[in-house]
Amino acid sequence: MGLGNLCSYKQDDSLDILQKKVLIDAFNKVTIDGKPNVQHQQPTYWYPPPPPRHHKEHKKSHHHWEYSSDDDSSDDEESCEKKKPKCCEKKKPKCCESEQNNGCGRRNQLARRLAFLGSFGDGDCDGCNEAFTVTGPITYFRTCPDPLTGITPAVAAAAATPAAAATPATPAAAATPAAPAA
């Protein structure tokens, strides 16, 4: 399963640990209004995964990264099952995607980061290859998965490239001396 665009990221086990770390490191460098984005920074380790809260929950969702580090008591299975139909009837794709594919709203760490980045776009989650900028030196792209491999190019590639040095301003041309008056 490919990454899809940032808004509709789904689990892709073909991403290796290094690729995941690159994405997270890039995310952690994002700044808001010139200040480090501490609010959304997360540790960059991936293994071992956090222990499941409930074994039943783990078997239900069938993937490895459904657990949030947040202890949200309102996000239990019962309340989520009640919310899910109403959410999807209203056709809120982010809500439905997170509840159906991430263990009842529990996004894995990478998905939560990419969803956050996607929120800085134009709000159209099915746009592809659209550049959008988070305040700071990095421009992120919504990219579509490669049609052959199904894997989306690393969205954080720009983060690995040092910011281009500012081009020095061209010196103003020397004023031509005025011709002597006749």
From Swiss-Prot:
Compartments it resides in: Spore coat; Cytoplasm
Biological source species: Schizosaccharomyces pombe (strain 972 / ATCC 24843)
Keywords carried by this UniProt record: Cytoplasm, Sporulation
UniProt feature, compositional bias: Acidic residues: 68-79
PTM comment, free text: Palmitoylated by the erf2-erf4 complex.
Positions of region (Disordered): 33-103, 163-182
Knocked-out gene: effects: Fibrillar structures absent from spore coat. Increased rate of spore wall collapse during germination. Spores sensitive to thermal stress, ethanol, and cell wall degrading enzymes. Normal rate of spore formation resulting in spores of a normal size.
Gene Ontology cellular component list: cytoplasm; Isp3 layer of spore wall
Official protein name in the record: Spore wall structural constituent isp3
Oxidoreductase among keywords: no
